[in-house]
Amino acid sequence: MRLGVAATPDVAIPTLDWLLGTDHEIALVITQPDKPSGRGRVLKQTTVAEWAEIHKIPVIKPQSPTELIGHLEDVDCVITIGYGVLLPQVILDIPRYGFLNLHFSLLPAYRGAAPAQRALLNGETVTGVTVFQLEKGMDTGPIYSQLSIKVEPHWRSVELLSELAHQGPNAVATALSMIEGNIKPTAQSGEPTLAPKITKEEARLNFSNSSESIVNAVRAFTYEPGAWCLWNDQPFKITSASVDGNQTLASGEVIVSEKRVFVGCGRDSAIELLTVVPAGKKEMPAIDWARGARLLGGENFG
Protein backbone atom coordinates (compact mmCIF):
# COMPACT_ATOMS: atom_id res chain seq x y z
CA MET A 1 0.00 0.00 0.00
CA ARG A 2 0.92 3.63 -0.44
CA LEU A 3 1.13 5.00 3.10
CA GLY A 4 1.47 8.24 4.96
CA VAL A 5 2.84 8.40 8.50
CA ALA A 6 1.81 11.21 10.86
CA ALA A 7 4.14 11.19 13.85
CA THR A 8 6.23 13.40 16.10
CA PRO A 9 8.13 11.58 18.89
CA ASP A 10 11.06 9.15 18.92
CA VAL A 11 8.73 6.21 19.63
CA ALA A 12 7.61 6.30 15.99
CA ILE A 13 11.08 5.40 14.68
CA PRO A 14 10.90 1.57 15.11
CA THR A 15 7.71 1.44 13.04
CA LEU A 16 9.12 3.80 10.41
CA ASP A 17 12.29 1.70 10.15
CA TRP A 18 10.21 -1.45 9.79
CA LEU A 19 8.01 0.04 7.07
CA LEU A 20 11.10 0.86 5.00
CA GLY A 21 11.86 -2.85 4.72
CA THR A 22 8.36 -3.88 3.62
CA ASP A 23 6.59 -3.81 0.26
CA HIS A 24 4.61 -0.80 1.44
CA GLU A 25 5.63 2.65 0.23
CA ILE A 26 5.97 5.58 2.63
CA ALA A 27 4.67 8.30 0.32
CA LEU A 28 4.95 11.13 2.83
CA VAL A 29 5.61 11.92 6.48
CA ILE A 30 3.48 14.41 8.40
CA THR A 31 4.90 15.93 11.57
CA GLN A 32 4.54 19.00 13.73
CA PRO A 33 6.19 22.29 12.74
CA ASP A 34 9.70 23.17 13.92
CA LYS A 35 9.72 24.64 17.44
CA PRO A 36 12.17 26.81 19.41
CA SER A 37 14.49 24.69 21.55
CA GLY A 38 17.27 25.22 24.08
CA ARG A 39 18.53 28.39 25.67
CA GLY A 40 19.11 30.00 22.29
CA ARG A 41 15.52 29.19 21.24
CA VAL A 42 16.78 27.92 17.90
CA LEU A 43 14.14 26.29 15.72
CA LYS A 44 14.45 22.51 15.89
CA GLN A 45 12.58 19.98 13.80
CA THR A 46 11.09 16.78 15.19
CA THR A 47 12.99 13.50 15.31
CA VAL A 48 10.54 12.14 12.74
CA ALA A 49 11.28 15.03 10.35
CA GLU A 50 15.01 14.34 10.68
CA TRP A 51 14.38 10.64 9.94
CA ALA A 52 12.36 11.49 6.82
CA GLU A 53 15.06 13.81 5.49
CA ILE A 54 17.73 11.13 5.95
CA HIS A 55 15.60 8.67 3.97
CA LYS A 56 14.59 11.27 1.36
CA ILE A 57 10.88 10.97 2.07
CA PRO A 58 8.70 14.06 1.53
CA VAL A 59 7.81 15.84 4.79
CA ILE A 60 4.98 18.24 5.47
CA LYS A 61 4.63 20.25 8.68
CA PRO A 62 1.13 21.72 8.62
CA GLN A 63 0.22 24.58 10.92
CA SER A 64 -3.42 23.53 10.53
CA PRO A 65 -5.05 20.19 9.62
CA THR A 66 -6.72 21.82 6.62
CA GLU A 67 -3.26 22.14 5.04
CA LEU A 68 -3.33 18.35 4.58
CA ILE A 69 -6.01 18.69 1.90
CA GLY A 70 -4.35 18.03 -1.45
CA HIS A 71 -1.64 15.79 0.04
CA LEU A 72 -3.64 12.69 0.99
CA GLU A 73 -5.82 11.97 -2.02
CA ASP A 74 -3.42 9.40 -3.54
CA VAL A 75 -2.56 7.78 -0.18
CA ASP A 76 -4.22 4.47 0.77
CA CYS A 77 -3.84 4.88 4.52
CA VAL A 78 -2.15 7.13 7.10
CA ILE A 79 -0.64 5.67 10.27
CA THR A 80 -0.46 8.05 13.22
CA ILE A 81 1.97 7.55 16.11
CA GLY A 82 1.93 10.25 18.77
CA TYR A 83 1.24 12.95 16.18
CA GLY A 84 -0.27 15.19 18.84
CA VAL A 85 -2.89 16.93 16.69
CA LEU A 86 -6.63 16.21 16.68
CA LEU A 87 -7.79 15.74 13.10
CA PRO A 88 -11.34 16.52 11.92
CA GLN A 89 -13.40 13.82 10.23
CA VAL A 90 -13.15 15.60 6.88
CA ILE A 91 -9.39 14.91 6.93
CA LEU A 92 -9.73 11.37 8.31
CA ASP A 93 -12.00 10.47 5.40
CA ILE A 94 -9.57 11.46 2.62
CA PRO A 95 -7.30 8.36 2.37
CA ARG A 96 -8.88 5.25 0.86
CA TYR A 97 -8.68 3.33 4.15
CA GLY A 98 -8.65 6.34 6.45
CA PHE A 99 -6.23 6.77 9.36
CA LEU A 100 -4.88 4.11 11.71
CA ASN A 101 -3.49 5.00 15.13
CA LEU A 102 -0.81 3.10 17.06
CA HIS A 103 -1.73 3.68 20.71
CA PHE A 104 0.36 2.63 23.69
CA SER A 105 -2.28 0.88 25.79
CA LEU A 106 -4.76 -1.97 25.56
CA LEU A 107 -7.81 0.06 24.60
CA PRO A 108 -10.31 0.95 25.87
CA ALA A 109 -8.00 1.30 28.89
CA TYR A 110 -6.01 4.54 29.08
CA ARG A 111 -7.50 6.63 26.30
CA GLY A 112 -5.59 9.88 26.00
CA ALA A 113 -2.19 11.51 25.75
CA ALA A 114 -0.24 9.66 28.46
CA PRO A 115 -1.25 5.97 28.46
CA ALA A 116 2.16 4.49 29.34
CA GLN A 117 2.77 6.97 32.16
CA ARG A 118 -0.69 6.44 33.63
CA ALA A 119 -0.24 2.66 33.53
CA LEU A 120 2.97 2.99 35.56
CA LEU A 121 1.38 5.46 37.96
CA ASN A 122 -1.35 2.92 38.68
CA GLY A 123 1.13 0.08 39.15
CA GLU A 124 -0.08 -1.95 36.16
CA THR A 125 1.81 -5.19 35.55
CA VAL A 126 0.47 -5.70 32.02
CA THR A 127 -0.12 -3.19 29.23
CA GLY A 128 0.38 -3.18 25.48
CA VAL A 129 -0.26 -1.54 22.12
CA THR A 130 -3.40 -1.16 20.03
CA VAL A 131 -3.85 -0.29 16.36
CA PHE A 132 -7.32 1.09 15.68
CA GLN A 133 -9.28 3.07 13.09
CA LEU A 134 -9.04 6.74 13.92
CA GLU A 135 -12.30 8.65 14.24
CA LYS A 136 -13.25 12.01 15.71
CA GLY A 137 -13.74 10.60 19.24
CA MET A 138 -10.61 10.36 21.41
CA ASP A 139 -9.17 6.85 20.94
CA THR A 140 -12.65 5.37 20.48
CA GLY A 141 -12.35 3.72 17.05
CA PRO A 142 -12.66 0.00 16.22
CA ILE A 143 -9.61 -2.18 16.82
CA TYR A 144 -7.50 -4.02 14.24
CA SER A 145 -4.82 -5.48 16.50
CA GLN A 146 -3.53 -5.58 20.07
CA LEU A 147 -0.35 -6.95 21.65
CA SER A 148 0.20 -7.20 25.40
CA ILE A 149 3.48 -7.08 27.32
CA LYS A 150 4.53 -7.64 30.92
CA VAL A 151 5.60 -4.47 32.72
CA GLU A 152 8.84 -5.12 34.57
CA PRO A 153 8.86 -3.68 38.11
CA HIS A 154 12.02 -1.61 37.51
CA TRP A 155 10.77 0.01 34.30
CA ARG A 156 10.23 3.74 34.21
CA SER A 157 8.33 5.54 31.44
CA VAL A 158 11.46 5.72 29.28
CA GLU A 159 11.94 1.94 29.39
CA LEU A 160 8.25 1.16 28.98
CA LEU A 161 7.85 3.51 26.02
CA SER A 162 10.89 1.95 24.36
CA GLU A 163 9.44 -1.55 24.71
CA LEU A 164 6.02 -0.46 23.46
CA ALA A 165 7.62 1.32 20.51
CA HIS A 166 9.37 -1.89 19.50
CA GLN A 167 6.04 -3.77 19.64
CA GLY A 168 4.56 -1.26 17.19
CA PRO A 169 5.75 -2.90 13.95
CA ASN A 170 4.11 -6.23 14.81
CA ALA A 171 0.77 -4.61 15.62
CA VAL A 172 0.87 -2.39 12.52
CA ALA A 173 1.79 -5.37 10.32
CA THR A 174 -1.29 -7.25 11.50
CA ALA A 175 -3.54 -4.24 10.89
CA LEU A 176 -2.24 -3.65 7.36
CA SER A 177 -2.66 -7.34 6.51
CA MET A 178 -6.25 -7.20 7.75
CA ILE A 179 -6.97 -4.18 5.55
CA GLU A 180 -5.45 -5.91 2.53
CA GLY A 181 -7.56 -8.99 3.32
CA ASN A 182 -10.70 -6.86 3.67
CA ILE A 183 -11.07 -7.91 7.33
CA LYS A 184 -13.02 -5.35 9.34
CA PRO A 185 -11.89 -4.04 12.75
CA THR A 186 -13.80 -4.89 15.94
CA ALA A 187 -15.61 -2.33 18.08
CA GLN A 188 -14.01 -1.58 21.44
CA SER A 189 -15.58 -3.32 24.42
CA GLY A 190 -15.18 -2.94 28.16
CA GLU A 191 -15.11 0.01 30.54
CA PRO A 192 -12.89 2.83 29.19
CA THR A 193 -10.40 4.68 31.37
CA LEU A 194 -8.67 7.95 30.62
CA ALA A 195 -5.00 8.93 30.49
CA PRO A 196 -4.80 12.74 30.35
CA LYS A 197 -1.53 14.58 29.86
CA ILE A 198 0.72 14.78 32.93
CA THR A 199 1.07 18.26 34.43
CA LYS A 200 4.14 19.53 36.25
CA GLU A 201 2.16 20.10 39.43
CA GLU A 202 0.81 16.55 39.33
CA ALA A 203 4.41 15.27 39.15
CA ARG A 204 5.25 16.87 42.51
CA LEU A 205 5.83 14.10 45.05
CA ASN A 206 3.80 13.97 48.26
CA PHE A 207 5.76 12.00 50.84
CA SER A 208 2.67 11.40 52.95
CA ASN A 209 1.66 8.86 50.30
CA SER A 210 2.78 5.24 50.54
CA SER A 211 6.24 4.18 49.36
CA GLU A 212 4.68 2.09 46.57
CA SER A 213 2.71 5.02 45.17
CA ILE A 214 5.74 7.32 45.31
CA VAL A 215 7.97 4.81 43.50
CA ASN A 216 5.23 4.39 40.87
CA ALA A 217 5.10 8.17 40.47
CA VAL A 218 8.87 8.31 39.96
CA ARG A 219 8.60 5.53 37.36
CA ALA A 220 5.75 7.29 35.58
CA PHE A 221 7.11 10.84 35.53
CA THR A 222 10.79 10.17 34.66
CA TYR A 223 12.04 11.97 32.65
CA GLU A 224 9.15 14.11 31.45
CA PRO A 225 7.99 16.19 33.25
CA GLY A 226 10.11 14.66 36.04
CA ALA A 227 9.06 13.56 39.53
CA TRP A 228 10.07 16.42 41.82
CA CYS A 229 9.99 17.86 45.30
CA LEU A 230 11.75 20.72 47.06
CA TRP A 231 15.14 20.69 48.75
CA ASN A 232 16.17 23.96 50.41
CA ASP A 233 13.31 25.60 48.49
CA GLN A 234 14.82 24.51 45.16
CA PRO A 235 13.34 21.96 42.70
CA PHE A 236 14.83 18.51 43.19
CA LYS A 237 14.08 15.61 40.85
CA ILE A 238 14.13 11.93 41.75
CA THR A 239 14.75 9.83 38.65
CA SER A 240 14.86 6.34 40.15
CA ALA A 241 13.90 4.88 43.51
CA SER A 242 12.85 1.62 45.13
CA VAL A 243 10.62 0.61 48.02
CA ASP A 244 12.49 -0.13 51.26
CA GLY A 245 10.87 -2.17 54.00
CA ASN A 246 13.46 -1.72 56.73
CA GLN A 247 13.29 1.99 57.56
CA THR A 248 10.74 3.82 59.69
CA LEU A 249 11.02 7.56 59.12
CA ALA A 250 8.80 10.61 59.26
CA SER A 251 7.24 11.56 55.92
CA GLY A 252 9.84 13.41 53.85
CA GLU A 253 12.69 12.79 56.32
CA VAL A 254 16.03 12.03 54.63
CA ILE A 255 18.79 9.89 56.13
CA VAL A 256 21.98 8.20 54.95
CA SER A 257 22.63 4.69 56.20
CA GLU A 258 25.36 2.31 55.03
CA LYS A 259 26.05 4.43 51.93
CA ARG A 260 22.38 4.43 50.93
CA VAL A 261 19.87 7.29 50.96
CA PHE A 262 16.37 6.79 52.37
CA VAL A 263 13.28 9.00 52.53
CA GLY A 264 10.31 8.46 54.82
CA CYS A 265 6.85 8.05 53.30
CA GLY A 266 3.31 7.61 54.56
CA ARG A 267 2.03 4.52 56.38
CA ASP A 268 5.40 4.09 58.14
CA SER A 269 7.08 3.20 54.84
CA ALA A 270 10.21 4.44 53.09
CA ILE A 271 11.95 4.54 49.72
CA GLU A 272 15.60 4.34 48.75
CA LEU A 273 16.76 7.07 46.40
CA LEU A 274 18.91 5.69 43.57
CA THR A 275 19.44 8.59 41.16
CA VAL A 276 18.55 12.27 41.51
CA VAL A 277 18.85 15.63 39.75
CA PRO A 278 19.53 18.48 42.20
CA ALA A 279 18.75 22.04 41.06
CA GLY A 280 21.27 23.20 38.47
CA LYS A 281 23.03 19.82 38.34
CA LYS A 282 23.02 16.74 36.12
CA GLU A 283 21.65 13.35 37.08
CA MET A 284 23.82 11.61 39.67
CA PRO A 285 23.74 8.71 42.14
CA ALA A 286 21.77 9.70 45.23
CA ILE A 287 24.66 8.87 47.55
CA ASP A 288 26.92 11.31 45.67
CA TRP A 289 24.36 14.06 46.17
CA ALA A 290 23.98 13.17 49.87
CA ARG A 291 27.74 13.34 50.44
CA GLY A 292 27.90 16.75 48.80
CA ALA A 293 24.88 17.98 50.75
CA ARG A 294 26.51 16.90 54.04
CA LEU A 295 23.29 15.76 55.63
CA LEU A 296 23.26 16.21 59.41
CA GLY A 297 20.00 14.43 60.19
CA GLY A 298 16.53 15.87 60.57
CA GLU A 299 16.42 17.32 57.03
CA ASN A 300 13.21 16.95 55.05
CA PHE A 301 12.04 17.17 51.47
CA GLY A 302 9.25 19.62 50.84
Label the predicted regions.
Residues 1-225, 269, 278-280, 299-302:
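One-carbon transfer enzymes
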Residues 207-302:
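An anion-binding loop in the catalytic cleft
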